[in-house]
Amino acid sequence: MTILTHTLGFPRVGLRRELKKAQESYWAGNSTREALLAVGRELRARHWEQQKQAGIDLLPVGDFAWYDHVLTTSLLLGNVPARHQNNDGSVDIDTLFRIGRGRAPTGEPAAAAEMTKWFNTNYHYIVPEFSKGQQFRLTWTQLLEEVDEALALGHKIKPVLLGPVTYLWLGKVKGEPFDRLTLLKDILPVYQHVLAELAKRGIEWVQIDELALVLELPQAWLDAFKPAYDALAGQVKLLLTTYFEGVTPNLDTIIALPAQGLHVDLIHGKDDVAELHQRLPVDWLLSAGLINGRNVWRADLTEKYAQINALVGKRALWVASSCSLLHSPIDLSVETRLDTEVKSWFAFALQKCGELALLRDALNSGETAALEEWSAPIQARRHSRRVHNAAVEKRLAAITAQDSQRENPYEVRAEAQRARFKLPAWPTTTIGSFPQTTEIRGLRLDFKKGNLDANNYRTGIAEHIKQAIIEQERLGLDVLVHGEAERNDMVEYFGEHLDGFVFTQNGWVQSYGSRCVKPPVVIGDISRPAPITVEWAKYAQSLTDKPVKGMLTGPVTILCWSFPREDVTRETIAKQIALALRDEVADLEAAGIGIIQIDEPALREGLPLRRSDWDAYLEWGVEAFRINAAVAKDETQIHTHMCYCEFNDIMDSIVALDADVITIETSRSDMELLESFEAFDYPNEIGPGVYDIHSPNVPSVEWIEALLKKAAQRIPAQRLWVNPDCGLKTRGWPETRAALANMVKAAHNLRQAK
């Protein structure tokens, strides 16, 4: 039985972010739909060929998405919210963009669908909306068209589908409450139709992603798998695909299904390969996810070989990435500025494909010399002086309980803060960033390339900060921000100023839609050699009598949005970052900054997928935040910001953060998230986001007032703040001014209505 290689998916955006540029050009009206579609075709063809050349035997098709693969599945099923539908009932790419963004070059603008995190990653998906009695039909044939493309190019392929049970699990009911699982019988005919079309094209295997099978599901959902897959069986071979966790707890459900193979994540799961082999049906193929799709580290292939070699010849076996390579940058070979030693520790998506090919060849032949050669830099790294810092390790070991305690409880601090700031009712603020204009990006790029000296760069940044303060004072905001003109990314900026991180030139990964991020890589112990944000915060405060917030990214978010080390625990990394940023809080306070925001949007996304593992994570995650913040005096107000979150199941931990003010993203969920805070009787102040910054639509004063009144039904008005959902970095100034003016007006109206 010859072992084959495959990947579960490949990065979509292109090495130079070609997809992002084509999307944004099309949205802005600067290019045609045909030009956008052509870029997609070119990227798919290139990526298939690159994977093939790197040694992948079965290429994934259907992993490409114009915005997000869950949204693609919604269109496949004809699940289009009424507000986004075309008058004639047709579905096109602008339908997709209206659902994701709220607007597109054609069609009427409408509220974008809710967006949330894809399991415990920093990728986002558009949440499917379900209503009672909903009908489904095949309306979007993107998958079939891409299969035809790949077949025409002569590739051996494996189409990828999001499974029906997981699709329903990821969605939300809108309107009259009902059990969305009852829709399963209605979407299965569409899946049957798609599988029949694939069978007509000679497809042998289909990868069907059922990530819900790694979760602690209610019994009714587990019971739904058998009848669903009984309905889907028989047309093609189904590779039941799971990742991000192990499957052993749900293995009884899995082995009862009429599938022909199972993919397991052997990186993030705790599954025992021998047990899987023993319990799986003898005729099932096992796809072993041995290469980590979520990081940038070179794999120890000798270790991977030892892990799986015992199964060679005993059952059909494929070797694969643990999950889609969507979460990894594309190609390490173009990183020309990385230190040679550090570069030898890494592998990006194409290199991971090469790792799979090396592993396949060794397993098929029994020859392991190439694996040992590939793995040599990993052994060298364990002893590198770039990894270990004795002073950091000593400070970490000396942490005590007192280091995570503010001087006094919230009630005492709140009195001191009210006396200091004298803010009005319904105080208005923003979350931190202002539009990153072409001028700002050009300024940073010129400085980075050496075309601008430090003095001229600083003068330019200072001018943009000054303009941000002027804009906010004109608008009448109560608590200001400096706008973050000097920051390229909320995590990358801090990583650039902390020892223990390195950066790539082209290490882009998709976050959502056209948004890409370039995560820093944690290669060693973390420390702060000098203040990071103090200079610009102090300058901004000198320009106004109103309070200006200091802006920090919190330790858990920096951890979650970086590629972490694999030789120490995530807890260790988070606490090292917390200690470094604790010193930053102290320095901001000493510089006269009275309000300091520590953003933790990733706190919930870092949760383990199984609830039984949550407590340990939340304990150290909360402790890291408190270590970061607890150095602040009573009269210093600590804010935190979170987004895309469901809070009801972690409210104990949200309260335990002990932030004086929390701002959250609520507008897309129509203030639904506040139910958690109301039910828990959240004791501190809260700023529910009143408009969606991910959409270019400008909210009306009436819309914002209505949301705030709804918020005041759940949270006492004297503890409410008024703010957008998130930072304004990706928006333009015209819509930003208009939206903030309406937000301030709504707050003033509510003050006068008291």
Curated annotation (Swiss-Prot):
Cofactor(s) in the UniProt record: Zn(2+)
Transmembrane annotation, as ranges: none
Enzyme Commission numbers on file: 2.1.1.14
Disulfide bonds: none
Keyword Repeat among record annotations: yes
Residues the entry annotates as binding L-homocysteine: 431-433, 484, 599
Active site per database record: 694 (proton donor)
Broad class of enzyme this protein falls into: transferase
Annotated L-methionine binding sites: 431-433, 484, 599
Pathway given in the UniProt record: Amino-acid biosynthesis; L-methionine biosynthesis via de novo pathway; L-methionine from L-homocysteine (MetE route): step 1/1
GO biological process, one term: methylation
Reaction equations catalysed: 5-methyltetrahydropteroyltri-L-glutamate + L-homocysteine = tetrahydropteroyltri-L-glutamate + L-methionine
Key words, A-Z: Amino-acid biosynthesis, Metal-binding, Methionine biosynthesis, Methyltransferase, Repeat, Transferase, Zinc
GO MF, any single term: zinc ion binding
Annotated 5-methyltetrahydropteroyltri-L-glutamate binding sites: 17-20, 117, 515-516, 561, 605
Free-text cofactor note: Binds 1 zinc ion per subunit.
Binding, Zn(2+): 641, 643, 665, 726
Pfam families found in the cross-reference section: Meth_synt_1, Meth_synt_2
PANTHER family found in the cross-reference section: 5-METHYLTETRAHYDROPTEROYLTRIGLUTAMATE--HOMOCYSTEINE METHYLTRANSFERASE
Family assignment from sequence similarity: Belongs to the vitamin-B12 independent methionine synthase family.
HAMAP family hit by this protein: Meth_synth (MF_00172)
Annotated function: Catalyzes the transfer of a methyl group from 5-methyltetrahydrofolate to homocysteine resulting in methionine formation.
Name listed for the protein in its UniProt record: 5-methyltetrahydropteroyltriglutamate--homocysteine methyltransferase
Species name: Salmonella paratyphi A (strain AKU_12601)
